[in-house]
Regions:
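Phosphate-binding site recognition
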Residues: 54-500, 512-517
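Residue-level detection of the helix-turn-helix DNA-binding "recognition helix"
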Residues: 21-26
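Short, charged/polar, Gly/Pro-enriched secondary-structure boundary elements
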Residues: 45-52, 445-449, 540-542
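Polyanion-binding surface elements
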Residues: 1-19
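Short beta-strand
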Residues: 31-34, 426, 519-524
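Structural signature of nuclease core domains in nucleic-acid processing machines
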Residues: 476-597
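Short helix-start
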Residues: 6-7, 29-52
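The DNA-recognition helices of helix-turn-helix-type DNA-binding domains
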Residues: 27-28, 111
Length: 597
């Protein structure tokens, strides 16, 4: 049989060598093999239509077998190697939604689970199989319990409990081999039947993991692997819909029975967005190893790396779109690894490379809404600084809990970070195991999410457009009317507590101009720091400078105070940066505030 190298095949098919290498990895050439680092491809495996034949993208696919056999699959199987190298008793992976958690957990299930099917066929062409017998000897050797709570999104505790109970029952039914087991006692089979037929109480359900692991251990003679995917989805629902204590109490007992001091457990895996250690769900569980977005371990296995995105673009013949895909969907950093949002990347390529905010429609953005609704003036100003492309430095607590959103101002940034709305630009480890971090908005997609939530939550959209029209037309009376009308409808008498509040409010109202201006806040220019500057992105529109004054004194004249703000712009030469940038027309605006005036 004659073999060709990648360069020869690329020339014959009229595609790049890199694309041929990618097709080899994907198994598109039957019989292709790697020899001394070079792919050798059977000549009879090459046909002209191969250059056009491409696997579909796995949009909405979380089934590992289906993904690897019928779709373009990004190989994440070395996660198995890294786990087996250290083998903690229970591993918790915390990542944002739609970053591949469920797919990876199903991969672990297929790898470890002992079944009648030879499931090694799904791994023989993957990277894990090249790592040697130390790793492959674990394939297909364990009974596995697998539960995913990703769809437990109910509005009441009663509905939530019912759905969890059904999921537990279905997992018992999946292990139908226990029904005819020769090693189980009559009583144990009766217990199995009660769960499989969904005839259990809430207390029974809390013992479900412990019981099923006992039965499987006894039947197979091997300890169990327990996998719980998206364990905190029902906890978030509990916070949003006022059954938080009920779900936390249930989960505490449920996990304690299955994962703490369970002699029938080989090892366990959990995924979620939050660690929630403070909630005592994992109280006293000293066998738990948490892997957060700040940790270096496993950093490349959730989401796509730069190289994986380049390979994918190459496979689909879209190499020229790399910079655009970086601008829109890159920017995350897990540990020290640069990561792209995988859901958005595959949707972008499938949607003919038209960029838009794919991720925002995949789940609730209520966290942002709640943060905005309860934000202090300082928090509001910081959120708008982030929206304008600035970084802020803040304490990050990776074990943040949902009720702290309103009570702990530092928790806001921790929530936004672990949920995928912020990226880490730099980390400064603290003695308590947490971090001080420089954080920023990761990419254009998330800017759209912020803008949508900020404007919608405060009902600003139409008002913002009108206010900006008044600014552009230099209509001071209309601007005053619109601002007062907005404040009357949108803020309480307690909100206007300091100048920082009004500063943040104005930043938010200017956010709609982000596609025409670089919006800057509290930056040095001339002899001091301006409040807000709008640096035009085109030469044919004016630049803007805003200076704000605030008073509580009802006797003080607001017009005189606004004049002082305007004079400060000139005295401090705040227009220096705009003039140095070649901006010819500069509009200076001084505004004074008192309460809702």
């Amino acid at each position: 049989m004659d073999y060709l190298f990648c360069g020869d095949v690329a020339q014959r098919l009229g595609i790049t060598t890199r694309r041929v290498q990618q097709m080899c990895k994907q198994g598109d050439f039957q019989g292709a093999k790697k020899d001394r680092g070079l792919w050798r491809i059977p000549e009879n495996a090459i046909s002209e239509d191969l250059s056009e034949k491409k696997k579909p993208l796995p949009i909405g696919v979380s089934d590992f077998k289906a993904a690897t056999t019928s779709y373009y699959y990004v190989d994440k199987t070395l996660l198995i190697r890294d786990f087996l190298d250290t083998k903690p008793m229970v591993s918790l992976f915390t990542r944002p939604r739609r970053f591949g958690k469920t797919m990876n957990m199903d991969m672990l299930r297929v790898f470890f689970e002992k079944t009648a099917e030879d499931t090694s066929i799904y791994f023989r062409d993957k990277q894990i199989w090249q790592c040697g017998d130390f790793y492959t000897q674990h394939q297909g050797q364990y009974p596995v319990i697998f539960l995913t709570f990703k769809d437990v999104k109910c509005l009441t505790w009663e509905e939530t409990y019912q759905k969890i109970r059904i999921l537990i029952s279905l997992e018992f039914m999946r292990h139908s081999e226990l029904e005819t087991s020769q090693t189980l006692t009559t009583y144990e089979k009766e217990q199995y039947h009660r769960f499989a037929s969904d005839k259990v109480t809430e207390v029974d359900c809390q013992m479900g993991l412990q019981l099923l692991s006992l039965l499987l251990h006894k039947h197979f003679g091997k300890e169990c692997v327990i996998i719980i995917d998206e364990y905190d989805t029902p906890i978030q629902q509990g916070h949003n819909y006022n059954f938080y204590s009920e779900i936390v109490n249930f989960m505490r007992n449920f996990f304690s029975g299955g994962l703490k001091d369970n002699s029938h457990l080989a090892f366990g895996f959990l995924t979620g967005i939050l660690r929630v250690a403070k909630e005592s769900i994992f109280s006293d569980m000293n066998n738990l190893k948490t892997n957060s977005i700040l940790d270096e371990s496993y950093s490349e296995y959730f989401g796509f790396t730069k190289e994986e995105v380049q390979d994918m673009l190459c496979y689909y013949g879209k190499e020229e779109k790399y910079q655009e895909i970086c601008d829109w969907y890159d920017g995350y950093r897990f540990g020290n690894t640069e990561i792209f949002n995988p859901w958005s990347v595959i949707n972008y390529i499938a949607d003919k490379c038209f960029p838009k905010a794919f991720w925002q429609s995949t789940g609730s953005n209520e966290i942002i809404g709640e943060i905005i609704a309860s934000a202090t003036p300082e928090t509001t100003e910081n959120l708008y600084k982030l929206l304008c492309g600035e970084k802020i430095t803040t304490y990050i607590d990776t074990s943040v809990i949902y009720p702290e959103i309103q009570s702990n101002p530092y928790s806001i940034y921790s929530f936004l970070l672990v949920a995928g709305y912020l990226k880490v630009a730099a980390t400064y480890p603290q003695n308590d195991g947490n971090f001080m971090c420089d954080v920023a908005i990761p990419n254009k997609e998330i800017i759209f999410v912020y803008e949508k939530e900020v404007l919608n939550r405060t009902n600003q959209n139409n008002t913002s457009i009108s206010i900006n029209q008044a600014i552009f037309s230099r209509d001071a009376k209309m601007l005053q009317f619109l601002l007062e009308d907005f404040m009357l409808k949108s803020i309480s008498s307690m909100d206007g507590a300091n100048e920082g509040f009004y500063h943040g409010m104005m930043l938010g109202l200017c956010a709609i101009l982000g596609n025409r201006y670089r919006i800057r806040s509290n930056r040095e220019s001339g002899l001091g720091r301006f409040d807000i500057q709008l640096m035009p992105l085109a030469n044919d529109i004016p630049g803007f400078l805003f200076e704000f004054k605030y008073t509580k004194d009802a006797r003080e004249n607001l017009e005189s105070l606004a004049d002082k703000a305007l004079q400060q712009i000139d005295d401090k030469k705040y227009d220096t940066e705009l003039r140095n940038a070649g901006v010819k027309s500069i509009i200076k605006i001084g505004i004074a505030f008192r309460g809702k005036n």
